[in-house]
């Protein structure tokens, strides 16, 4: 696994989505999951990221019940920083899970994880994936994006908005620079923390029943896993 130095900024504010020209990308994983979302049955869908009117509309137009939670923003709260037995800086995973992703077991039919594992602090990734497993129904689907080895530490973090069954709009997420709550002024971007290879991705989702990789494009590989 390839790691990058640097960290994200803690902030009381929500991530700001830049007004630069918006980009779109075709998503094979989205295309696959859209078949499930075409079901006449009402599904519970968890969209991890800042509230997206596009995504809410896409889900509700199909009769589904959407939930949204910005777990990445919550993960950079400086109050979560602690030290392990060796004195290494880690995040307090127990506190984080007590305050975030608090849903009944086997509650969701579909979870859009997007690029969360690539930008979240290393000590939180496995606990969060474990929590996602527990709140996803057996047979439920999870979609995640992972950067390839060609991506650098400054690879921008995007919020993905669903335009149609296989097309996503990408908006660069920027955190307002400030020095409040111990944040370092001038650090305004989520930084790519690591690059997972296929073996690491398989290990991350080892408790899931099935995993499917889609052909990577734009230095991003898409992964769909089944609970």
Where are these regions (language model features)?
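Class I (Rossmann-like) S-adenosyl-L-methionine-dependent methyltransferase catalytic domain
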Residues: 1-37, 52-102, 141-227
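Nucleotide donor/acceptor-binding cores
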Residues: 42-44
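Conserved S-adenosyl-L-methionine
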Residues: 46-49
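Hydrophobic beta-strand segment of the Class I
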Residues: 111-112
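Hydrophobic adenine-recognition pocket in adenosine-nucleotide-binding enzymes
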Residues: 116
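A short glycine-rich, Lys/Arg-flanked "PGG" loop and its adjoining helix->strand segment in the class I
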Residues: 124-141
């Amino acid at each position: 696994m390839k790691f990058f130095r640097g960290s994200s900024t803690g902030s009381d504010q929500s991530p700001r989505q830049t007004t630069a020209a918006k980009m779109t990308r075709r998503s094979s994983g989205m295309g696959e999951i859209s078949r499930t979302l075409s079901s006449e049955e009402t599904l519970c869908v968890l969209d991890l990221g800042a509230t997206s009117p596009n995504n809410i509309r896409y889900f509700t137009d199909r009769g589904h019940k959407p939930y949204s939670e910005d777990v990445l923003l919550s993960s950079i709260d400086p109050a979560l920083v602690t030290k392990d037995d060796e004195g290494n800086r880690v995040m307090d995973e127990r506190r984080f899970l007590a305050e975030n992703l608090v849903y009944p077991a086997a509650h969701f039919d579909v979870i859009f994880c997007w690029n969360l594992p690539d930008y979240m602090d290393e000590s939180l990734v496995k606990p969060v994936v474990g929590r996602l497993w527990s709140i996803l129904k057996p047979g439920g689907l999870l979609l995640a994006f992972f950067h390839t080895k060609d991506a650098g530490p400054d690879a921008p973090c995007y919020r993905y908005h669903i335009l149609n069954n296989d097309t996503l709009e990408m908006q660069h997420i920027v955190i307002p620079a400030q020095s409040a709550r111990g944040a370092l002024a001038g650090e305004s971007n989520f930084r790519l923390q690591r690059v997972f290879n296929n073996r690491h991705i398989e290990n991350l989702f080892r408790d899931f029943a099935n995993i499917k990789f889609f052909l990577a494009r734009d230095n991003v590989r898409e992964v769909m896993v089944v609970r």
